[in-house]
Amino acid sequence: MPVLLDPENALALDVLLAGTDAQGLDWHLSAPDAADLPRIRGIGTLSSAGSEEISFLSNPRYQNQLATTRAAAVIVTPDVAQARQEQGASGHVLVVCKHPYLLYARLAQWFERASRPAGPAGVHPSAVVDPSAEIDADARVGAQCVIEAGARIGRGARLGPGCVIGAGSTVGADSLLHPRVTLYAGVHVGERAIIHSGAVLGADGFGFAPDPTLGRGAWGKIPQLGGVRVGNDVEIGANTTIDRGALDDTIVGDGVKLDNQIMVAHNVRIGAHTAIAACVGIAGSTTIGERCTIGGASMLSGHLAIADDVNISGGTAVTSNIAKAGRYTGVYPYAEHSEWQRNAAVIQQLALLRRRLRALERE
């Protein structure tokens, strides 16, 4: 029961669905004969939902839970609804939809908005705002935020406590920065972005040049003069870092979703609607196409080009360009330690074994 409306605010199921952003999802209701449509106060899983909550079935492995769920209504696919009808199963109001997971997402968004504390617009008295900064009258700036010179905060934007917006940076309309987000100078965040706590955008990229005048093996710093540009409808997870470009900006396209603890180095470009799971490291100047997915803990070398519609499995090390859409995996499977040691010993001898095999073939 993650979200519940007060009893007086419960909504009839059809009213709730009509009030969500469910247009185009082609849903309809299937109710037992003479059943009244339930009033809904929340949303939950099949195993945890109560009698005033709606649930959903999108993964067939949980289909057996339909028989025991207490949910007032369940979102299912047309195939599941037809199968239940043929089996004579009854008792639940069904919301029949080709995309139950997407309809669940829309409902979750509605409940999140409905339960969000409204809070007044304005700037908290403890915030420090440079006189040249521009803050829209409908924006909300939390306690102990710092807004530096020339920064702009758009209409309906919300900044949680302790956020820092550097000089000349912008936060677009209706964007949400959770507590302690840091935007260095020259970082531009689009509209409807969500940035979670601890994220840092615009820190210096890792740029150094060998400089023998400073000593043997010494490095001279290369100032990072670019910025960071984040598109519309982007979400950035907690403690993710996006470095500023050396000269050109680091770019995160529209609709990109970044999980927690991702490292995006300087001058990386991430195409629209790409989703990247936690703990991925992307080295400098790599370009990732649109609609890609990158599994957790993957590593991408620098100066690479990744095509559109590429799916990279978790833990993969990408060290060369990927020019063709598709799924790519480069993970050595786990095994019991003793077996892994034996396999590793064989791998180290592959070149020798190959030479021996070729010699045998020539005989």
Swiss-Prot record:
Under the heading InterPro entries, the entry gives: Hexapep, Hexapep_transf_CS, LpxD, Trimer_LpxA-like_sf, UDP_GlcNAc_AcTrfase_non-rep
Report which superkingdom the organism of origin falls in. Bacteria
Q: Which UniProt keywords apply?
A: Acyltransferase, Lipid A biosynthesis, Lipid biosynthesis, Lipid metabolism, Repeat, Transferase
* Residues at the catalytic site: H266
Pfam families assigned = Hexapep, Hexapep_2, LpxD
Q: Carries keyword 4Fe-4S?
A: no
User: HAMAP family from the xrefs?
Assistant: LpxD
The subunit structure is: Homotrimer.
Q: What is this protein called?
A: UDP-3-O-acylglucosamine N-acyltransferase
Native source species:
Bordetella bronchiseptica (strain ATCC BAA-588 / NCTC 13252 / RB50)
Gene that this polypeptide is encoded by: lpxD
